[in-house]
Amino acid sequence: MIWGSDSHNPSNNPAIAPPPGTHNASIYLVAGIAALGGLLVGYNTGVIAGAVLFIQKDFHLNPTQEEIAVSAGLMGAIIGALCVGPMNEALGRKRMLKILAVIFIAGSLATAVAPTYGFFLSCRIIVGFGFGATGSVVPVYLSEVAPANLRGRIVTFNQIAINFGIALSYWVNLAFAATGKGWRPMFAVAVIPSAVLFLGMFITPESPAWLASHGRWDAARRALERLGRKPVEIEQELNSIRWAGELKEKRAWRELLRPGLRLALVVAVGLAFFQQFIDPSP
């Protein structure tokens, strides 16, 4: 028997695979709330593009300082992306998104009232930590709450939200630039979706997979019920989660370097790197 073969995954067994179309509005509501994290990633990434012209005038920045102002958020994002993994596993997806929403609220407000250039940079690094971490947490959460037959569709909510957030930041920049109100309201606007994300996470369930991985099987069952799963689907998903946990224990990270997987790993990492390097975002 070869571990990892699709034939051993309960969700891939035709006899017990979830029937197509078995879902309701619950999963879309949860996905829509969580995708606000993606919107905040896009908005906080894009807003600096229009705001920096006004910031340069207010703080009398030279070209080097202007470049640092633009890149400060990305510096924080690198830190957030590197640090979020262990925190996400320890605290859970739902709690992490609440914490990140608070970071966005506080960071956006502080950025909007920044009295000095140095204070502004500090705030942008904090917000950058938030969107760097959120970019990792949201897709994991979406993939773990979605049923197998909808997983691809639900996970794309995050990328759609990121791009919409970038576009929204440009529209907001244009609106405030036209009214002559300057750069501060541009950053303050991010408080609104941040607050909605924070409040929305109180009505969403924790990831069933995360709960099960911490031995909280009854809580995982209740989470699946809240997500609208039928009793038979709940048993199927719990079996699939249990199977995945057993497989994880049998695998080691070094197996990614096996000849059969090495090329795929290099291609996947390379695509992710060059996607960001060439910046294809609008």
Indicate residue ranges for each PLM-predicted region.
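Transmembrane-helix signature of 12-pass secondary carriers
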Residues: M1-P282
